[in-house]
Amino acid sequence: MRYPIVIHKDPDSDYGVTVPDLPGCFSAGSTLDDAITQAEEAIACHLEGILLDEEPMPTPHSIEYHHQNPDYADGVWALVAVDLAKISGQSKRINITLPARLLSQMDQFAANRGETRSGLIAQATMEFIAAHREPTN
């Protein structure tokens, strides 16, 4: 899963990072590279909290979607890849059967986003459950 981040820098300060799709998820770094690295950790921790609280996983929007927001004007945009399979707790090996063409498409899609096959399956499953979850009282 790739989350867009926006990085701002004020004079005499570190780089500040905002994750628009994850309200309350912020980070900072002394350089742009450090800011992005710190954002990866902040996003992973934030998503881990969401998983532990059994809340729906927020689906990231495109940079273009957020670029329209004046709060993010003059920011530097980047995408941060997070492998949900690595943060979703203890993993369990499963055996599934899929059409070869679908498997090939999955692998290519995951590779293009710096994810694993397992991470893609976990992400797709969480998004599907979140989209089809019955409201609870």
Regions found by a protein language model. Name each.
Residues 17, 35, 91-92, 126-128:
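Acidic/histidine-enriched, beta-strand-rich ligand/metal-binding domains
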